[in-house]
From Swiss-Prot:
This is tRNA-specific 2-thiouridylase MnmA. ATP binds at A23, L24, S25, G26, G27, V28, D29, S30, L49, G135. It comes from the Bacteria. The record marks H136, Q347 as: Interaction with tRNA.
Amino acid sequence: MVISPHSSVSPVASPSRPRIVAALSGGVDSSTVAALLQEQGYAVEGVTLWLMRGKGQCCTEGLVDAAAVCEQLGIPHHVVDSRELFQANIVDYLVAGYAEGITPLPCSQCNKLVKFGPLLAYAREKLGISQMATGHYARVRFNAELGRYQLLRAVDRQKDQSYFLYDLSQEHLAHSLFPLGEYTKAQTRQLAARYGLVTADKPESQDLCLIETYGSMRSFLDQYLGQRPGEIVDTQGRVLGSHEGIHHYTVGQRKGLGIASSRPLYVVRIDAAMNRVVVGEREEATQAEAWVSQVNWVSIPAPTGSLAVEVQVRYRTPPVPAMVIPESPERVKLQFAEPQFGVTPGQAAVWYHGDLLLGGGILERPSP
């Protein structure tokens, strides 16, 4: 990670004013966090990660807006050149995953390996600050009985982002604040307007930063993987059509298959070894159970026995009842109360007890 020479010099904070870093993307949420913490008496310093190579909203407008907010609040602004880190841990990770026929989840990976860990290290080593705050909609509490920091859903369930934070460590949570976890998005907008922030009316980003840069995930992947034609087959192996690359497909997909059929067909699995997309009827794209690896137990120690939970297998899907059956602390089997449609290898399965996020991991490819 290379530190930009444009970082400003930190002022000496009063002993009575705790120092904190605000991770600023240039959006209304992180901007409001900086203003809110300043109002609460913190000596705030803004840090923006320069992530993407080339042009894009997250690389140009975001940096400019973050700098404008810091100038408006009268706080230092530091820019950290994280482009190589982002390329290695996110871009290369995505490309490799799609080439193998899975659908990776970049946001949780980015939070752990690009944002929280490196940003906390930068704050400590370069600024002498041990606390950071972000604009994520989530909550953290300390459970004294367990001696453990716990991650909870945000008050605003429509904006809750705890799903993307499941892979954070106790060290990350111990030194992170999520001030917006107690607010709704509408209240955040109201706060931004009250503070008169230049980002108060900025539209909310709807896509991954990669999509904002490349226009679409398809364009992004085509730049790296190109076209790799192959067959679309049914579950019996009959050829129904052709595709231009398995990286254009994901399990559960129905639209854009480009094949004629008298009944609705969905992507059931992706066979990377044969360069094939396998399609079938909806029932064939459902699973009663799934294996999850790279598990991180966030709010509780890893259990030795089965656990009844509510699990999300995608960010926008509602939680459903399931049993978590540990094989080891790092690998578990999920048994769904009812078969689930479109359980996608590479995505995260994250399980909760009410608002409490217990743990999560990466969905494995099912056995053929």
